[in-house]
Regions:
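Amphipathic alpha-helical interface elements
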Residues: 1-138
Length: 138
């Protein structure tokens, strides 16, 4: 199992002007960390986790039922997945829907006024990622 990425490294990766890259890559880091939690906490082989039949919904069900993930962290993961799906499956995603999803994201801590169109998204990805990494280290 590789060492988790630092928050600073993820922040640098998310510093892109390409919306599709931002939303797909941001979610990839979240889901990859979820995969590693499942491997470590439940001894699920990576071969099984990598199967297309092992969907994010199934992964989230396992983590939710076990009590590992709940509340705003769960909500953020679900919203990040919805945003990712819009960009992965539509040539021109509905910008208003994306804005609404981002508005629903939780900072998972205090936050000062954000600047930039997707600043809140970036902060929420990094903080959700950070919470998941802490879960992985327990």
């Amino acid at each position: 199992m590789q060492k988790p990425l630092s928050d600073a490294a993820l922040k640098k990766i998310l510093d892109t002007a390409n919306e599709r890259d931002l939303f797909i890559v941001g979610h990839m880091y979240i889901e990859n960390t979820i995969d590693r939690i499942l491997e470590k906490k439940f001894s699920i082989p990576s071969k099984s986790i990598d199967s297309t039949l092992f969907t994010l919904n199934l992964k989230m069900d396992i983590l939710t039922e076990s009590g590992l993930i709940k509340g705003n962290v769960k909500k953020n993961v679900e919203l990040l997945a919805r945003i990712r799906n819009r960009y992965a499956h539509r040539l021109e995603p509905n910008e208003q829907r994306i804005t609404n999803y981002i508005r629903e994201l939780q900072y998972l801590g205090s936050a000062s006024k954000t600047a930039g169109k997707y600043a809140k998204y970036r902060i929420c990805v990094i903080r959700t990622f950070s919470v998941l990494v802490k879960m992985l280290r327990k």
